[in-house]
From Swiss-Prot:
GO terms for cellular component: cytoplasm. It is found in: Cytoplasm. It comes from the Bacteria. Its EC number is 2.4.1.25. It catalyses: Transfers a segment of a (1->4)-alpha-D-glucan to a new position in an acceptor, which may be glucose or a (1->4)-alpha-D-glucan. Its main location: cytoplasm. It is an enzyme of class 2 (transferase). Keywords: Carbohydrate metabolism, Cytoplasm, Glycosyltransferase, Transferase. One of its GO terms (molecular function) is 4-alpha-glucanotransferase activity. This is 4-alpha-glucanotransferase. The keyword Repressor does not apply. SUPFAM superfamilies: (Trans)glycosidases (SSF51445). Catalyzes a disproportionation reaction in which single or multiple glucose units from oligosaccharides are transferred to the 4-hydroxyl group of acceptor sugars. Glucose, maltose and maltotriose can act as acceptor, whereas of the three only maltotriose can act as donor.
Length: 487
């Protein structure tokens, strides 16, 4: 469950009391992992997979009550603000309009000159923080237009122009640094609390970066861009398949892996190091893109005319191991996989993913059926891109697939189809099993987080107050203990 989906008073889940209470709930339920979506600052469309920075955190998650405890805000500054009337859905427009004003007030009450920890944070994170903070100050100054539409000198980062805006926007730049300081401070305290309860945080890293991001603006050489306009030459996507005749056109700029290799993959090493400050375990999205990626000419309307290009494969991960050491990674290996992709994943040793909803098409050799699992995998009841179990049974699953699922897991209405599927995942040989919180709560597709290739209402679901009960925790604990997953 993502941070944004936590219950609470101020429109969106935060690093506040509800997050700590959720850690308590997970401990009572005998759970060892809390998997979340990317924590990056969201942009248009509110997707955590399209953020303004691969390094910065989302200011929306900063808890206002904690700022009050630090004497940076009075309760009157935020308690009566309109963050949205529906506690089960995030209104991102209101959060953007109201919460950012409140956070600005907190900054105005913050004495950065006398705060040694703030100065240390700025120095420690200087490599990305300076560019990001200037980027965000410029985004606000230029009414959020894409940096590709800024005037040429600042778009191309001419030194005189950079220095001019650093001076002109000095206070705004410092404000964005303050927000990152608060984000990382509050998150560290929450993560430490979870870790003391023997709960590891599984974080999510998108393989690609948004074109309209501080990373592309400040590091154009690591992407395949037109040297004059800095627009992409190639963009990301995936090829046509049984689900889409034209494929999926994601539109992110493609890495210049040749250039990155010459730098010993410095940017990627920095990114992994930074991510390990946030998470204990990293799930890397679209992992197959490191073996080979689908490259589409910029300007194409669909992905169907793209082609496969070889990726860095083990060269990248050998450098990461050399520079950082052994780290825990989950390879998101869903979708179109070739023998080369499977062999590459095997060489990394990283566990892949098994999604139970994919199990009931085809015959008994379907790799997503639990009897075909290998131990070195992570089994899921679903992900942010799937229906809930209840939604699958009620709406989207085919009659044949649902009949197979009922027979395979011996599902009954008395037990509850959701609990029967969870039981099936928990009882598998997978080293790790993870359930979507909506499935434990037996919610339908109204609680689905994301429907790919659509825009409306994605990333908006929030849990109701008081749903993480002792009764539910005990039920999850009993199931977890039966299958030896508490040890």
């Amino acid at each position: 469950m993502h941070i944004s989906s936590l219950p609470g008073k101020y429109g969106i889940g935060t690093f506040g009391r509800s997050a700590y209470e959720f850690c308590d709930f997970l401990e009572k339920a005998g759970q060892k992992y809390w998997q979340i979506l990317p924590l990056g600052q969201t942009s248009y469309g509110d997707s955590p997979y399209q953020s303004f920075s691969a390094f910065a955190g989302n200011p929306y998650f900063i808890d206002l009550d904690i700022l009050n405890e630090k004497n940076l805000l009075d309760k009157d500054d935020y308690e009566e603000k309109n963050f949205g009337d529906n506690k089960e859905m995030i209104n991102y427009g209101l959060i953007f309009n109201e919460k950012m004003k409140v956070l600005r007030k907190a900054y105005m009450n913050f004495n950065s000159k006398d705060d040694e920890s703030f100065a240390k944070f700025i120095e420690d994170e200087k490599k990305w923080l300076d560019d990001y903070s200037l980027f965000m100050a410029l985004k606000y100054k230029f009414n959020f237009i894409s940096w590709n539409s800024w005037n040429k000198d600042i778009k191309l980062r001419k030194n005189e122009e950079i220095e001019k805006y650093k001076d002109e926007l000095k206070e705004d730049v410092n404000y964005w640094k303050f927000l990152q300081y608060e984000f990382f401070s509050q998150w560290k305290n929450l993560k430490d609390y979870a870790n003391k309860k023997n709960i590891k945080i599984i974080g999510d890293i998108p393989i690609y970066i948004a074109q309209d991001s501080s990373d592309v603006w400040s590091n154009p050489d690591i992407f395949l861009l037109n040297k004059e306009t800095l627009e992409p030459l190639k963009v990301s996507g995936c090829p046509p398949d049984a689900f889409s005749e034209t494929g999926q056109l994601w539109g992110n700029p493609i890495y210049d892996w040749g250039y990155l290799e010459k730098t010993n993959f410095e940017w990627w090493v920095d990114r992994i190091k930074s991510s390990l400050k946030l998470y204990d375990i990293l799930r890397i999205d679209h992992f197959r893109g490191f073996e080979a990626y689908w490259s589409v000419d910029y300007g194409e309307k669909t992905a169907q005319n793209g082609k496969w290009i070889k990726g860095p494969e083990m060269k990248l991960f050998n450098v990461i191991k050399e520079k950082i050491g052994d780290i825990e990674i989950i390879a998101e290996d869903l979708g179109y996989l070739t023998e080369e992709t499977l062999e590459f994943k095997k060489r990394t040793g990283f566990p892949g993913m098994k999604i139970i909803q994919f199990a009931f098409g085809g015959d008994s050799s379907n790799p997503y059926l639990p009897h075909n699992y290998e131990k070195n995998c992570v089994a899921y009841t679903g992900t942010h891109d799937n229906d809930t179990v209840r939604g699958w049974f009620e709406v989207t699953g085919s009659k044949e697939e649902k009949e197979k699922a009922v027979e395979y897991f011996k599902l009954t209405e008395e037990e509850g189809y959701n609990w029967g599927v969870i039981r099936g995942v928990w009882s598998s040989v997978a080293n790790t099993s993870i359930g979507v919180m909506q499935d434990f709560l037996n919610l339908g597709n109204e609680a689905r987080i994301n429907k790919p290739s659509t825009l409306a209402s994605n990333w908006s679901w929030r849990a109701k107050d008081n749903v993480f009960t002792n009764e539910l925790a005990n039920k999850i604990y009993r199931l977890t203990r039966i299958y030896g997953r508490c040890e």
